[in-house]
Amino acid sequence: MLKEERFQQILQYLQKDNKVVLSDLSRVLKVSEDTVRRDIKELSAQKLLKEVRGGALPHAPGPVDFKERENYAIRKKQVIAKKAVGLMKKGQVIILDSGTSALAVANAIPKDLNITVVTNSFPVVELLDERKDIEVFFAGGKLHRESLITTGHDTIGFFENIRADLFFLGVCSIDIELGVTGHYYDECAVKRAMIKSSREVFALSTPEKLNTAEAFSICQLVALSGIITSSPESSVMKTYKEAGINIV
């Protein structure tokens, strides 16, 4: 079997099963595990999958750039946002992450809740600019153009001095073993600081982001108070519920 044919089959199995295992691929493709490992490394270099110990996981579907993501899965994000604001209480300090799901949460905050929102997201600040009932703190730093946020040491230092009641974490990928992962190193570093500064952390995730992985680690699932999703009864959520993860 030619290498290109193996590549095609590996990607087909990945699409079908949402993961591939070296030993299984070795048996099916009738090649050594070392050969399969090299194939996966090459596919990972082409950004067609994420290499993990013993196999590979898919990347999360959908666009990466913020402006492209704004019109992606809008209805699902609205469902998530409604659940998120239901967890807010009057007078709380809330950290809102970057991402279009967090923007949907900001848009859904009810009137006269009188909360404080802390964020590094330019779109969130712009949206809340006219909300006189919400006190807004913005973390300065280096502009990250793809995500329309600030990053860097100044941003991290800012969040280290915050004590928030709730943090709504926008995610690229979630996996039961790898936890929450993201595309950009600098952005993930800021998210880790946000987690450390928050009493409760809720990940905002549509079902298709589960069982996927990206390059940079944010946190293990034990750091989460729960996962807020648009389809809590989806079959993909079963493994997470069985692991004791709170699914909202």
Task: Identify what each model region corresponds to.
Residues I74, Q78-A81, G99, L103, ...:
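Hydrophobic alpha-helical segments
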